From Swiss-Prot:
<keyword id="KW-0812">Transmembrane</keyword>
<keyword id="KW-1133">Transmembrane helix</keyword>
<keyword id="KW-1003">Cell membrane</keyword>
<dbReference type="Pfam" id="PF02104">
    <property type="entry name" value="SURF1"/>
</dbReference>
<protein>
    <recommendedName>
        <fullName>SURF1-like protein</fullName>
    </recommendedName>
</protein>
<dbReference type="InterPro" id="IPR002994">
    <property type="entry name" value="Surf1/Shy1"/>
</dbReference>
<dbReference type="GO" id="GO:0005886">
    <property type="term" value="C:plasma membrane"/>
</dbReference>
<dbReference type="InterPro" id="IPR045214">
    <property type="entry name" value="Surf1/Surf4"/>
</dbReference>
<feature type="transmembrane region" description="Helical">
    <location>
        <begin position="201"/>
        <end position="219"/>
    </location>
</feature>
<feature type="transmembrane region" description="Helical">
    <location>
        <begin position="7"/>
        <end position="23"/>
    </location>
</feature>
<comment type="similarity">
    <text>Belongs to the SURF1 family.</text>
</comment>
<keyword id="KW-0472">Membrane</keyword>
Length: 240
């Protein structure tokens, strides 16, 4: 009886997890479709965003703040030099908002030249809003002293730069306003190419549930066979 109960509970949990993953599959499909629509639509002003900030194409006008650049480490497979940094600079809009903007990527050997990229002239930036990154325990801490960042956590960035930053940053589209050849433009079209593995997860849970039932049926049949043989032998002995 105890075994039956444990099997039933485990089977119910596995099936529930499978249906939960199917629900997540539907939610993620809608999310990716919405993101793709946002990325392919014309850029809008920040004030026009109604359904949350992340993954919208926006345009902002203002100026970069000098001497506030951040070097966010990242590998770039399309470059002959794999190791380098994303240039991230605070941008003060005409609405008096301060937003971090990821402007482009440069190789490690150009780190000393990239300081020429920032000026205080007014510019219009078009890009995609992104949420703050979370600090991950398996990554080293940001090297603030040498300005080498591994995680763009906006709360930490605000504290280090001494700025009241918005709770999102922007990946700029196209070539940077500096026109420096060493600063490679960032692509935004790939942002919606996120894997949706929830169907595989659902099939895994359903498969485990089916496997559990198969194993249980085999176990019950063998248990019943072992139980029947001694009783049959006992009956033969009594007849003798």
């Amino acid at each position: 009886m105890k075994t039956n109960f444990l099997v039933f509970i485990t089977f119910t949990i596995l099936i529930s997890l499978g249906f939960w993953q199917l629900s997540r599959l539907k939610e993620k499909k809608l999310f990716l479709a919405s993101m793709q629509a946002n990325l392919t639509s014309p850029a809008i002003n920040l004030a026009e965003i109604q359904d949350g900030l992340p993954y919208h194409k926006v345009k902002i006008t203002g100026q970069f703040l000098p001497n506030k650049d951040i070097y966010l480490y990242g590998r770039r497979s399309m470059s002959s030099e794999k190791d380098g940094y994303y240039l991230v600079t605070p941008f003060k809009t005409i609405e008096d908002k301060v937003i971090l903007v990821a402007r482009g990527w440069f190789s490690n050997r150009n780190k000393n030249i990239i300081t020429q990229a920032t000026n205080d002239r007014q510019h219009e930036i078009i890009g995609v809003t992104m949420p703050s990154e979370k600090t991950r325990i398996y990554l080293p801490a940001n090297d603030i002293k040498n300005n080498v960042w591994l995680t763009l956590n906006l709360k930490e960035t605000s504290k280090v730069l001494g700025l009241d930053l918005e709770n999102f940053y922007i990946i700029a589209e196209g070539k940077d306003i500096s026109n420096l050849d060493i600063l490679l433009p960032l692509a935004i079209n790939h942002l919606a190419a996120i894997r949706n593995d929830h169907l595989e997860y659902a099939l895994t849970w359903f498969g485990l549930a089916i496997s559990l039932i198969v194993i249980y049926v085999i176990y019950r049949r063998r248990y019943m066979a072992v139980d029947v043989i001694p009783r049959a032998c006992s009956g033969i002995q009594k007849n003798n």
